[in-house]
Amino acid sequence: MLSSSSLYAAIDLGSNSFHMLVTRETAGSIQTLAKIKRKVRLAAGLDKQNRLSQEAMQRGWQCLQLFSERLQDIPQDQVRVVATATLRLATNADEFLQRAQEILGLPIQVISGEEEARLIYQGVAHTTGGPDARLVVDIGGGSTELATGIGAKTTQLISLPMGCVTWLDRYFSDRNLEAGNFERAENAAREMLRPVAASLREQGWQICVGASGTVQALQEIMVAQGMDEYITLPKLRQLKEHAIQCDKLEELEIDGLTLERALVFPSGLAILLAIFQELDIKTMTLAGGALREGLVYGMLHLPVDQDIRHRTLATLQRRYLLDTEQAKRVSTLADNFLQQVARDWQLDSRCRELLRSACMVHEIGLSIDFRQSPQHAAYLIRHSDLPGFTPAQKKLLATLLQNQINPIDLMPLSQQNALPVNQAQHLCRLLRLAIIFASRRRDDTLPAVRLRVEGEALRLILPAGWLAQHPLRAEMLEQESRWQSYVHWPLMLEEAPA
């Protein structure tokens, strides 16, 4: 039974939506128990004098009535409620906040834009893998936050008064998706970014992470259309052209774009186009968490792990009682194989990390049943919360585990979008071989195997006499050679001269 003392909640009164995150602390991380979101569009209720309309406030209060029931089970000192851009701006914010605090029975903190950027950065730092030096971008309903940092430490925090709701009302109020509206929206956003662009570019970040509904929508679109998960300027421009062809906001249809996100998608897209151009961003990926996760981790006072993915994999190993020594054995072998073929097969550090991750949890399916354990492993990975891994990376891990033994199914390898198909196939081949060679579960039985690449053909060179001395693994390798040949992956076995 869950103890209420292990429960934490964070509420974000945003300009477009109100969100509540309910979690519990587990093994130095947080486990999500509930996410509740209601489209309140508070910013749309601001008039020219920045007064909130009664209708907008009523929408907000009704939403908080829903939230308040869930909060009754959580200690008050383990709940944080913050308000952002619209309530920073509204001249009658006190009227809204007084009633809101009565409904929740909790204080509500109207945070500054810089504090919002800091919390967003912390949420990303605790949940998102990749290089330590990062730029974080969050396009909200009424403001856009930009934060740079290294590890857990922020180096620059910026909040700009432009958001997908305010830009919708300002530049797409006629509901026309014409090129002129996009141009005006982009130019206005670029103008707002110019005073801070140079200093942001100088921070030396290695990775750009997006933590907003706009970026989430883009990720869903790209997955639905079979693209890889990396957001780039050409992809954004392609989507803009598609939107322009739709002519009207009500007629906007893009594969993967949900009706819920469609209304503010063009305005968010215009802002993101401006950010990419002004900051010279090459690629962006989706964050694993943002403001609400930052609030929860702040209450827990947990340090930011140097390697979030390692923490996630270690948590899975403990939860499912995996043999960590065997995982390490397979990982070491697979890494050795990868380094031998990396140049010929163009396998970079990203491939190396994903292969290592698959090795660390390759036996997770055994926790359900030996029979069909690869399918069980794929299911568990596909449906687990894996901080540090993007949705596309989760899908690739599941696909690799599904294909770790037995006949090879090429379809899921071609349908994943974390890596080019040929790289994913090469990782699959190396994982399968490492599992075979490590099958006796002892370090002293691992042979010194040399790998030679000849196009797509892979030649394994074993110590003299090894195949005769190890008949079971020799038979497994012969079977593996046949299975790989069925999918046109030539695999040859030979022994070095005595």
Swiss-Prot record:
BP GO terms, sorted: guanosine pentaphosphate catabolic process; guanosine tetraphosphate biosynthetic process; nucleobase-containing small molecule interconversion
Keywords: Hydrolase
First-tier enzyme category under EC: hydrolase
Molecular-function GO terms, alphabetical: exopolyphosphatase activity; guanosine-5'-triphosphate,3'-diphosphate diphosphatase activity
Hydrolase among keywords: yes
Reaction(s) catalysed (UniProt annotation): guanosine 3'-diphosphate 5'-triphosphate + H2O = guanosine 3',5'-bis(diphosphate) + phosphate + H(+)
SUPFAM superfamilies xrefs: Actin-like ATPase domain, HD-domain/PDEase-like
EC number per UniProt: 3.6.1.40
Listed transmembrane segments: none
Tree of life domain: Bacteria
Pathway the protein contributes to: Purine metabolism; ppGpp biosynthesis; ppGpp from GTP: step 2/2
Function: Catalyzes the conversion of pppGpp to ppGpp. Guanosine pentaphosphate (pppGpp) is a cytoplasmic signaling molecule which together with ppGpp controls the 'stringent response', an adaptive process that allows bacteria to respond to amino acid starvation, resulting in the coordinated regulation of numerous cellular activities.
Family in the record: Belongs to the GppA/Ppx family. GppA subfamily.
Record-given protein name: Guanosine-5'-triphosphate,3'-diphosphate pyrophosphatase
Origin species: Pectobacterium atrosepticum (strain SCRI 1043 / ATCC BAA-672) (Erwinia carotovora subsp. atroseptica)
